[in-house]
Amino acid sequence: MAHARVLLLALAVLATAAVAVASSSSFADSNPIRPVTDRAASTLESAVLGALGRTRHALRFARFAVRYGKSYESAAEVRRRFRIFSESLEEVRSTNRKGLPYRLGINRFSDMSWEEFQATRLGAAQTCSATLAGNHLMRDAAALPETKDWREDGIVSPVKNQAHCGSCWTFSTTGALEAAYTQATGKNISLSEQQLVDCAGGFNNFGCNGGLPSQAFEYIKYNGGIDTEESYPYKGVNGVCHYKAENAAVQVLDSVNITLNAEDELKNAVGLVRPVSVAFQVIDGFRQYKSGVYTSDHCGTTPDDVNHAVLAVGYGVENGVPYWLIKNSWGADWGDNGYFKMEMGKNMCAIATCASYPVVAA
């Protein structure tokens, strides 16, 4: 019992210390806060090694916990998380030996079971009926660029983090709206995901349990607008709607849907219009994506398979493999600075089954 209490205290200290380290990584070694965080990390390391034994792998796990601000309740949980971490590390190593066009890496999800990850980061699968017959008007194909990255145009807002809430659809929605607004006005803006979590249920959305950008665009259109992030900040839990019309910053005039499975339409929209909200099926393994062009023979290709909404901000070719460039909502320390590439041309993981973009008032 005494050992468990020491471990719990050490891990609690770790969570505070890791936050300080994450927010102060550029501090010089002379910073007076540094010795405190180093001592806390040392205490955690000793506690973890005490629970697991002094091995190189246990030390790697302790350093992982420090880096990501982990906090575990008991020695039993440390051992369980260590087992999951070990399995994740083996998956990374075995996948990276296969010569695939992408690579995996250890990240903040590497000590989570697949069931935990699904419950806290993904939404329930929903049928995207709005895309059965799309209304995107194809633009001149001759003007379509060979590659596109809307970040270079300065209209893509920074990567955000949905945290422990299946609200990916709200971040895909606001990402598309923020890009459209900046494109139309030349002004940057951050919009409220929490408003969508709390208020868009009447349009077949379910807060932290999932939703669709196309349905969120319709909600905003009929609601009369969406508040700023500052006026309606993100909490990452389901709450009571307290939208205030006076804080509405962007109005949606209409939404445009890409025809089901039509990657040519999607490429036309991404290349010639602006970033497009898309959804796809996340399967176990993708959560540890690090770089390269993701491809899989195991994910689905129908609207009923999708469980995660994101934002397509461009496309290109890497080592001969065409790809979609996609902004995620799992933080800037995930993947390739918060982004990933998905193979283009095969409706990979149903990426072209649930795509739409908004038209906003300037």
From Swiss-Prot:
Induction: Aleurain is synthesized by the aleurone cells stimulated by gibberellic or abscisic acid. Residues 1-22 form the signal peptide. It comes from Hordeum vulgare. Residues 23-143 form a propeptide. May play a role in proteolysis leading to mobilization of nitrogen during senescence and starvation. Belongs to the peptidase C1 family. It holds the Pfam family Inhibitor_I29. The keyword Disulfide bond applies. It comes from the Eukaryota. Disulfide bonds join 165-208, 199-241, 299-349. It is found in: Vacuole. One of its GO terms (molecular function) is cysteine-type endopeptidase activity. The active site is at 168, 308, 328. Its EC number is 3.4.22.16. CDD domains: Peptidase_C1A. This is Thiol protease aleurain. GO terms for cellular component: vacuole.
